[in-house]
């Protein structure tokens, strides 16, 4: 006797079912031995599940230009960056990259949404890499966890069926569209960062300058008030 391994690869299309609705894939192998008159048949099936995220980008003062906002998505489970292609306003994952420079840059659409489909049940980090001028960049990456649990068996082949759940930064998220999409919102606030590129001395000099300006303003106001009283 001998063992033969047959491998094949399949690609999920944009029409793939998402969430708890699986994509069944059945394989039937038929072969005949040279010393027999009958055929042997082997059947196997698998159920593929796929998920997505819907990021809503907002500015706290309803200002800001969404086109200046950029995100990067990292698969923490496999330690790779997500590569995706955009079609009709939706990003579809098509592969992974080991280097950060090769990762896809995700930009919100006109309504502020970034929809990414074709993700596995893994742990992801969503990092904001750029935002509009005069707004504070998101400090920490958003941690997204998509996990599955057994929910039964396929009556036809006995394969385990799955149901999904998700958390965002450790808090339970209510998935939409039959546990297909993880919704989350990222908000930027107006603000500025003091320059620190010159080192500790330069930063302290900047802070000191601001303090001196405040003192000068106080002195001017106090002086004017004193003169008006005279």
Model-inferred region functions:
Residues 1-230:
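Solvent-exposed loop/turn and edge beta-strand elements of beta-rich ligand-binding domains
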């Amino acid at each position: 006797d001998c063992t033969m391994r047959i491998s094949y690869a399949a690609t999920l299309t944009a029409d793939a079912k998402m969430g708890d609705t699986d994509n069944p894939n059945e394989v039937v192998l038929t072969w005949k031995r040279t010393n027999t008159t009958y055929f042997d048949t082997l059947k196997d099936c698998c159920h593929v599940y796929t998920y997505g995220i819907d990021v809503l980008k907002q500015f706290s003062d309803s200002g800001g230009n969404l086109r200046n906002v950029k995100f990067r998505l990292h698969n923490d489970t496999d330690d790779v960056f997500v590569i995706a292609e955009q079609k009709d306003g939706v990003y579809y994952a098509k592969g992974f990259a080991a280097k950060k420079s090769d990762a896809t840059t995700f930009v919100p659409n006109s309504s502020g949404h970034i929809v990414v489909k074709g993700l596995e049940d893994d742990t992801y980090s969503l990092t904001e890499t750029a935002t509009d001028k005069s707004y504070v960049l998101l400090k920490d990456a958003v941690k997204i966890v998509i996990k599955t649990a057994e929910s039964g068996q396929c009556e036809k082949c006995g394969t385990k069926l799955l149901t999904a759940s998700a958390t965002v930064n450790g808090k339970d998220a209510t998935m939409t569209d039959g546990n297909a999409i993880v919704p989350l919102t990222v908000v930027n606030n107006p603000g500025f960062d003091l320059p620190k590129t010159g080192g500790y001395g330069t930063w302290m000099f900047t802070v000191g300058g601001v303090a001196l300006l405040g003192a000068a303003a106080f002195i001017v106001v106090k002086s004017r008030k004193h003169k008006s009283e005279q």
